[in-house]
A protein has these predicted regions:
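Structured, charged N-terminal subsegments at the starts of enzyme catalytic cores
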Residues: 161-192, 201-202
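CE4/NodB-like, metal-dependent polysaccharide N-deacetylase domain
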Residues: 209-248, 328-345
Length: 665
């Protein structure tokens, strides 16, 4: 469970994600598991999340910019504030969170809202973020959901008051489950930094030799130590006991950072399977199914495939079927490795908004199956440390994203952010002797906050958010505030945005006109796909990441007769897959297509395919009696889903083909 520090120099939280995930995920995740007998798990809670969540205990509107504006009467909002509130209220996943509320769906696409409509939008936005526990057990939330529309200012006040009371009990609930032996709680270095990069930027090159790192970088080993010790202190102050385990931010490790953790009393950590495979110079998965001892520290290595099944693949599937599939995958491993330890490690908050009912149905099915299973039991990480371990002689540097650090360093924007951080460090050092202890302490706080991995995550073109400008400003403001504390003028470069102007158009271009390409698998004409829509899979990852599949770009479009698709990417790897599954709703078509040139019938739906320079599909429209359809694809290899397309969920196609909204004049 993690959120970066969204506070500005005045201490006001600039983005509402801590509060929103608190009412949706932070209580729900342990609660859903604790409903089932005999299950155990480990929950990781980061320091910035702890610090900010505590600010919502009393009068949350005084600590959160969004909630302060949200609570206002809409008639009192300045125009820019009004636009920002509406933007946030429309930032929710439509199919799983907006669509279940009829009134929310009505308002979602309205461009102009009167004051009463805005109150409805605001209330329904917060209600859509309420998790299953609140929807089932809280009378205030249930009554407001039942009201459906025509909310009042008093409803807003009541809602915020009730949710403030609710979030104030979250950490005590974790402590209760910990004390009863149901869960173990771990934490992460203070501001979620990539410790190996703080220790030595050369780790980025060791993990991937092609990585460009900043020139004249500084080793920030003292900061790395503070990130660890301060996290431990805050954890103890919050929960009343010592943190014995750490999830290094983003599973990022190297030998020196792990030695640092051990020296601070940490007994176990977890990271990704890619680190193990690189450390052993072997990809034999049997090596994954145990715990390891490295320098007297216990390490569990995350099973990427099993974890991604839950985090990504199952979101579109029937809950019972998904649970049975997962148990089947566990059983395959158990039959070959009866004493195997499996480490399933997940993003605790960002996946569930893509599931129906915030993942409740899926987890209820899975936890029921696990609770009644005789050959598999769940364990806490502190229990794992008591089991026999395999010795690991060396530890390769890397993270849980492709075993490298390229998500946080390498791109020109990421490099620029690091350079500004190092510049500020050098300027601060020149004036350090002139500063009193209180000022030094405040400056150190800003440096530790600026080292958060999240800022670097959003720089570059590998992840997208509509709030990139806000993240960029928060990062630079930490450095500007340092110059203000020193008493000197901040460099002009700090007032220039690092992040380039980006929008969803960078990864998703909608069709501009009809197309009628010949389906032959060949890149034989520049004009073949002119006017098509494009989904760039390489650029659409957001708050979560996974191993990226072979398909990197999708072209799509239609004419009077057919809907066309072209899949580009690593064609050999793509065609080595067993099949591509096509799912079309609401006409309930689902079928497998092979990577060859042929005609296939899915029921009465005729589908042409061709494989060559890329893979192409044409779907006959004549049997589709709908104005709009939703299509997604699943790339299957050896019975496993290795990629879901498009990565943002499903492609909605308007069969009426009104392109006017996509034209630029």
């Amino acid at each position: 469970m993690h959120q970066p520090d969204y506070r500005d120099s005045s201490g006001i939280i600039q983005m509402p994600w801590v509060f929103l995930h608190a009412i949706k995920d932070y209580y729900d995740m342990p609660w859903m598991m604790a409903r089932h007998d005999g299950l155990k798990a480990t929950f990781n809670i980061t320091a910035p999340l702890i610090q900010q969540l505590k600010l919502y205990y009393n009068a949350p509107e005084e600590s959160d910019k969004f909630l302060a504006l949200w609570l206002k009467n809409p008639s009192l909002l300045e125009e820019e504030d009004r636009k920002w509130v509406i933007k946030l209220c429309k930032s929710t996943q439509f199919d799983t969170m907006v669509k279940p509320f009829e009134r929310y769906s009505e308002l979602y696409y309205e461009e102009h809202l009167n004051n009463l409509e805005l109150i409805d939008l605001e209330v329904l936005f917060i209600l859509s973020w309420c998790g299953e526990y609140l929807r089932r057990d809280n009378e205030v939330i249930k009554a407001l959901i039942d009201k459906k529309r025509d909310y009042s200012y008093d409803d807003k006040s009541l809602l915020l008051e009730e949710l403030s009371r609710f979030v104030s009990g979250i950490f005590s609930y974790y402590a209760k489950l910990h004390n009863s032996g149901v869960i173990t709680i771990s934490t992460t270095p203070l501001n979620h930094p990539i410790l190996p990069l703080l220790m030595d930027m050369q780790n980025a090159i060791k993990a991937n030799i092609n990585t460009a790192i900043p020139k004249d970088y500084i080793k920030l080993e003292d900061d790395a130590l503070l990130q660890v010790t301060r996290a431990k202190d805050l954890f103890h102050d919050t929960f009343g006991f010592e943190a014995e385990g750490f999830w290094p931010a983003e599973g990022a490790v190297d030998e020196k950072s792990v030695e640092l953790l051990k020296s601070c009393g940490i007994k176990w950590i977890a990271t990704d399977e890619e680190i193990l495979f690189k450390s052993l110079n072997s990809k034999d998965r049997k090596n994954l199914y145990t715990q390891y001892n490295y320098n007297d520290l216990c390490i569990g290595f995350r099973d990427h495939y099993l974890s991604d099944l839950i985090g990504f693949t199952y979101r579109h599937q029937d809950s019972g079927s998904a649970s049975r599939h997962f148990m089947g995958e566990l059983e395959k491993i158990q039959q070959e490795n009866p004493d195997a330890s499996l480490f399933v490690i997940l993003d605790g908050e960002n996946a569930w908004e893509f599931f129906q009912n915030n993942g409740f149905d899926f987890f209820n099915a899975l936890y029921s199956d696990l609770s009644s299973c005789s050959w598999c039991k769940t364990m806490r990480m502190d229990e794992i440390t008591k089991l026999p371990r395999e010795d690991l002689l060396s530890l390769a540097p890397g993270s849980w994203i492709n075993g490298s650090f390229n998500t946080w360093v390498g791109h020109s924007e990421k490099t620029r952010a690091w350079e500004l951080l190092f510049l500020t460090k050098r300027d601060c050092k020149h004036h350090h002797s002139e500063l009193d202890e209180d000022t030094k302490s405040k400056i150190q706080d800003h440096f530790l906050a600026a080292e958060c991995s999240d800022w670097f995550w959003w720089y570059g073109d590998d992840h997208f958010t509509e709030f990139g400008a806000e993240f960029d400003e928060l990062f630079r403001m930490h450095l500007i505030d340092i110059y203000d504390l020193i008493g000197i003028t901040a460099p002009a470069d700090l007032f220039v945005p690092i992040i380039k102007d980006r929008s969803a158009g960078n990864f998703w271009l909608k069709p501009q006109s009809d197309i009628s390409p010949v389906i032959n698998g060949k890149h034989d004409s520049f004009f073949k796909w002119i006017g098509c829509g494009v989904v760039d899979e390489s650029k659409l990852f957001s708050t979560m990441d996974r191993q990226r599949g072979p398909i990197q770009k999708i072209n799509y479009g239609q004419d009077n007769e057919k809907i066309y698709f072209a899949f580009k990417g690593k064609i050999k790897e793509m065609c080595s897959a067993s099949s591509i599954i096509i799912i079309i709703d609401p006409i309930n078509v689902k079928g497998k297509l092979s990577f060859e040139t042929k005609k296939t019938f899915l029921g009465n739906l005729e589908v042409d395919t061709a494989c060559g320079d890329w893979f192409e599909i044409a779907v006959d429209k004549n049997k589709i009696d709908k104005d709009e359809i939703s299509i997604r694809f699943e790339l299957e290899k050896d019975g496993n889903i290795i990629q879901i397309l498009p990565g943002f969920g499903e492609l909605k196609i308007d069969l009426s083909r009104d392109y006017s909204q996509n034209w630029f004049v």
